[in-house]
């Protein structure tokens, strides 16, 4: 079986484009580790042109996969002070499936070829490590963390990766807000878009996110029921007051199809989020059904959006709408 020394030796066969040294010797390759048959490495590509970064990425993957016993190679590229945008996924109320929606939007965007990462900003109730099956503790350099790669193409950082499972986080607001900043200000490499899974409510974490990290827009998740919509409206008002655009509303848990007879029922009501969006003059991004398959896949750490079946389609449609909002096509000139 290979060990870390085998990986380091392989990396040193790839020359640093700037110094000519091996990648491990030059310090360009770091956080080298072996998990079973999977090799992980972080490569600093600061100072390299995009074509050179791509070439280096391919070379690193090739030498790692050539090590006997290595079946998979995960390479995370990092660079200094990248330009990236942040989109907040929020709700006024807990239990509406916001984290599941955030995870699947990120995965759907990654499948579209977007360089996307996810920050689990729900400091007190982190769930993204479970949704992505990514429980590894993140590495750090100079007290700055590196996101944990996932097999779904979306690197993530979460407080759930830093504490023992089941342990409560008894922090006051300023400490939680500081933790959020550490997650956002991590070594995100060439990630162009960060999906921020916010905790429910309108407290210190949300205010820090708005004041310090300034998302380009926010998506509000709600169930159709009136109680959830009342709290969602409070979250919308917070973003309105901060002059942060609302990209749109999503209605989650919208309709339940009986697995035996196929009859559709609406345990949480029907159309409430769409009606609220119309009343507020906001875009409605779509409905996600209350489906057993989505729940079981999410609990197993397999985001449904990674597939192409019916359960994935609502997430793909929402991701396309978000991508169009972020990258609008130029209007034709007549």
Describe the function of each predicted region:
Residues 163-212, 229:
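Phosphate-binding/switch loop-helix module in NTP-utilizing enzymes
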Residues 1-30, 67:
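N-proximal, solvent-exposed amphipathic alpha-helical segments enriched in charged/polar residues
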Residues 2-5, 26, 45-50, 55-62, ...:
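C-terminal lobe/tail of nucleotide-utilizing enzymes
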Residues 17-42, 74-77:
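Short edge beta-strands and adjacent turn/loop segments
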Residues 11, 29, 64, 83, ...:
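Residue-level signature of catalytic and energy-coupling elements of molecular machines
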Residues 85-123, 236, 240:
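Walker A/P-loop phosphate-binding motif and the immediately C-terminal alpha-helix
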Residues 109-171, 177-179, 184:
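Phosphate-binding loop that captures ATP/GTP phosphates
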Residues 191, 214-235:
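Conserved Switch II/interswitch segment of TRAFAC-class P-loop GTPases
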């Amino acid at each position: 079986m290979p060990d870390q020394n085998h990986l380091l030796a392989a990396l040193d066969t790839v020359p640093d484009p700037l110094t000519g040294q091996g990648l491990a010797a030059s310090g360009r390759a770091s956080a080298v580790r072996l998990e079973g048959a999977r090799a992980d490495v972080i490569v600093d590509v600061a100072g390299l042109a995009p074509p050179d970064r791509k070439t280096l990425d391919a070379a690193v993957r090739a030498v790692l996969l050539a090590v006997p016993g290595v079946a998979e190679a995960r390479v995370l590229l990092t660079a200094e002070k990248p330009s990236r945008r942040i989109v907040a996924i929020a709700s006024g109320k807990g239990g509406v499936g916001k984290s599941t929606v955030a995870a699947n939007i990120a995965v759907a965007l990654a499948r579209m070829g977007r360089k996307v990462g996810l920050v689990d900003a729900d400091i007190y109730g982190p769930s993204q490590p479970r949704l992505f099956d990514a429980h590894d503790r993140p590495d750090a350099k100079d007290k700055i963390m590196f996101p944990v790669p996932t097999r779904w193409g979306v690197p993530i950082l979460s407080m759930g990766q830093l504490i023992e499972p089941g342990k409560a986080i008894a922090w006051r607001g300023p400490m939680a807000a500081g933790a959020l900043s550490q997650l956002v200000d991590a070594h995100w490499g060439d990630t162009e878009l960060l999906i921020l899974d916010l905790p429910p409510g309108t407290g210190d974490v949300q205010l820090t996110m708005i004041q310090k990290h300034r998302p380009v827009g926010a998506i509000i998740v709600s169930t159709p029921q009136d109680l959830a919509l009342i709290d969602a409206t409070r979250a919308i008002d917070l973003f309105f007051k901060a002059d942060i655009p609302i990209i749109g509303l999503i209605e989650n848990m919208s309709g339940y199809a009986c697995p035996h007879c196929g009859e559709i029922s609406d345990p949480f009501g029907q159309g409430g989020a769409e009606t609220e969006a119309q009343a507020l003059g906001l875009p409605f991004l779509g409905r996600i059904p209350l489906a057993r398959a989505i729940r079981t896949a999410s609990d197993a750490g397999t985001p449904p959006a990674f597939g192409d079946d019916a359960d994935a389609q609502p997430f793909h449609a929402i991701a396309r709408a978000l991508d169009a909002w972020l990258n609008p096509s130029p209007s034709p000139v007549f």
